[in-house]
Curated annotation (Swiss-Prot):
Entry function: Probable adapter protein and signal transducer that links members of the tumor necrosis factor receptor family to different signaling pathways by association with the receptor cytoplasmic domain and kinases.
Name of the featured protein: TNF receptor-associated factor family protein DDB_G0290965
Organism of provenance: Dictyostelium discoideum (Social amoeba)
Intracellular or extracellular location(s): Cytoplasm
Record bears the keyword Secreted: no
Entry comment, domain topic: The MATH/TRAF domain binds to receptor cytoplasmic domains.
InterPro entries: Sina-like_RING, TRAF-like, Znf_RING/FYVE/PHD, Znf_TRAF
MF annotations from Gene Ontology: zinc ion binding
Domain (MATH) ranges: 420-563
Keywords for this protein: Coiled coil, Cytoplasm, Metal-binding, Repeat, Zinc, Zinc-finger
PROSITE patterns hit by this protein: ZF_TRAF
């Protein structure tokens, strides 16, 4: 019987030869030891393992030794004395051998000889009934190293020591704190580690981190060659950084300091002038903003008044419909009263006729039939009037729904009459244009038109309003303050409001693109163009570079834009 896929009970039993000679603990049929077998016996005491009994009983219903009758396994009794006696026999642990039997058994030579590992193997002698529990907890069992990449197989009691020294153990660099380096590659890592301390390449005897070497040379190293701090102002001496203080102490730099002071004073004056100009422009912008706010408020009031006029008209129509319905109700009530009075008069006449002419029953009957016909007609007329009233109620409800729809249509008039134009302006060779005009320049896009056609079904007339536009791009803004400005310039746009949506495209990251929207009219002093829409301060002009994503590899700047024209003037239809 196998202990596991590598060992049988025969491999570990003590005194196996003695047990084999006695045959007391072997099945007399299959001749195997009764390890992990259920033993059954007949009434005469002849025993065998359960597997052999089942095979034999399929052929003959009798004991294999004494031939006594046995119908099934249920006629047999369990032989616990033999099972328990074998469980008390002693054996070795399977981990008392070396690990040759613990390699991949698919490639194992079946004839390999078991070798005792006297130095490192398990030395315990165990009862057979305790073998499974011991194997599970044995400290001498073979295990694999837990570190990724290490194929070492060793005993459990030496695993901890091995894993601490294993070359595949992940270690943390004490310089850069990275923790994904294995122990045997730590030296190679130190040769590349950006935080590993190395000597200055200019031999200044200072240890610096590898990635800070250039910064040390540029800013701190005493052996670096530097220029005099007044180099730009006339002192053209170069020296080591350690000699700078002696140079400043020994050489008179008052003349060069005077030049520096003059330049700083000049820049300070220019800065004050620029500041004054900016203040003026800000004040002018605030005034322009107030004007735009007033124009917006006026436009808002006009729109509200128009909506109110339309609503008032619909309210009057509804009131007229209600009056019409009220008149119809009165007419219906009057008709009903007239019908009742006529019926009463006819009935009275019939009664009198009956009282006066009891003898002439046939004539009375005819008169009665006539009055019945008249009543039927009156009933039909009443039913028609009721249907008329129901139709009027439906018309009233329909009028209310139409009024609501007209209100919604009025709210959508601006968007329905709007003209839309979408395009993009690509400025090629942007960097070259900037170099040619370092102080800033104005770039104008090609002109474009936004057309509107109003077709009237009752007339073969087409009114075309041509709106001419172009985009103006100011490299340094309107006031040369190193801020990009973009405006839409409009012509022939009398009686319209314009919405201008512009996006400065970032080709590296779309989320960094700058988008703005204007819908306010702005009067400008240009005699050629009537109106303009845009923004003065979009982005610093010096940020428009390929590295920042605003320019493509072939030096192009892309501006996407949309133009909407809302026509607020609706002329009445005439036919």
């Amino acid at each position: 019987m196998s202990i596991n896929s590598k060992f049988t009970i025969n491999d570990v039993l003590l005194n196996i030869e003695s047990l084999q000679k006695k045959n007391k603990y072997s099945c007399p049929i299959c001749f195997e030891f009764i390890y992990k077998k259920s033993i059954f016996q007949c009434k005469s005491g002849h025993f065998a393992c359960k597997e052999c009994w089942e095979k034999s009983l399929k052929i003959k219903k009798e004991c294999m030794i004494c031939r006594s009758k046995v119908n099934s396994i249920n006629d047999l009794s369990r032989c616990l004395v033999i099972e328990q006696g074998f469980g008390k026999k002693e054996c070795y642990c399977i981990y008392s051998f070396n690990n040759d039997h613990f390699i991949d058994y698919a490639n194992l030579d079946e004839n390999i000889t078991l070798v005792k590992d006297k130095e490192n193997g398990c030395k315990e002698i165990i009862n057979i009934d305790q073998l499974d529990r011991h194997i599970q907890n044995c400290k001498f069992k073979f295990v694999e190293c837990s570190h990724n990449g290490c194929d070492v197989v060793l005993r459990l009691n030496s695993l901890k020591e091995h894993e601490n020294q294993c070359g595949y153990k992940l270690v943390k660099c004490k310089y850069c704190a990275c923790d994904d380096t294995i122990q045997k590659e730590l030296e190679n890592h130190n040769n590349e580690c950006p935080k590993f301390p190395i000597g200055c390449p200019q031999s200044c005897s200072i240890m610096v981190e590898r990635d800070q070497t250039q910064s040390h040379i540029n800013n701190d190293c005493n052996n670096s060659t530097i220029q005099c701090k007044y180099y730009e102002y006339g002192c053209k001496v170069e020296m080591k950084r350690s000699e700078l203080q002696n140079h400043l102490n020994n050489v008179n730099h008052q003349y060069f300091m005077g030049i520096l002071i003059d330049k700083l004073s000049s820049k300070l004056i220019q800065s004050h002038n620029i500041q004054d100009e900016l203040v003026k422009k800000i004040e002018q912008s605030e005034k322009n903003q107030e004007i735009l706010n007033k124009e917006y408020d006026q436009s808002k009031v006009i729109c509200e008044n128009r909506s109110k006029i339309i609503c008032d008209k619909h309210v009057k129509k509804i009131e007229q419909l209600e009056k019409t319905q009220e008149n119809l109700n009165k007419q219906f009530e009057l008709s009903r009263i007239i019908g009742e009075n006529r019926s009463k008069i006819i009935c009275d006449k019939l009664v009198k006729t009956i009282e006066k002419s009891e003898k002439n029953q046939e004539n009375l009957y005819k008169e009665y039939e006539r009055s019945k016909i008249i009543c039927d007609k009156l009933v039909k007329k009443i039913e028609q009037l009721e249907k008329t009233q129901e139709n009027l109620n439906k018309q009233f409800e329909l009028s209310r729904i139409i009024c609501d729809k007209l209100q919604k249509q009025n709210d959508q008039l601006l968007s329905l009459n709007a003209l839309k134009y979408k395009n993009e302006w690509i400025i090629s060779d942007y960097s070259k244009i900037v170099k040619k005009n370092p102080k800033g320049s104005l770039l104008n896009s090609p002109s474009f038109q936004v057309n509107q056609n109003n077709f009237l079904k009752s007339q073969s007339l087409c009114n075309i309003l041509q709106n001419i536009f172009h985009l103006s791009f100011y490299q340094n803004g309107l006031s040369r303050i190193n801020k990009i400005a973009i405006f839409l310039m409009g012509k022939s746009i009398e009686g319209t409001n314009v919405e201008f949506i512009c996006k400065l495209v970032n080709v590296l990251d779309e989320t960094n693109s700058i988008k703005f929207k204007t819908q306010k009219l702005k009067d400008i002093d240009d005699l050629e163009w009537d109106w303009s829409w845009g923004r003065s301060y979009i982005i610093d002009s010096n940020l428009i570079t390929q590295e920042n994503g605003w320019l493509t590899k072939d030096d192009k700047l892309t501006i996407e834009f949309k133009v909407k024209i809302f026509n607020n003037v609706n002329k009445p239809l005439e036919s």
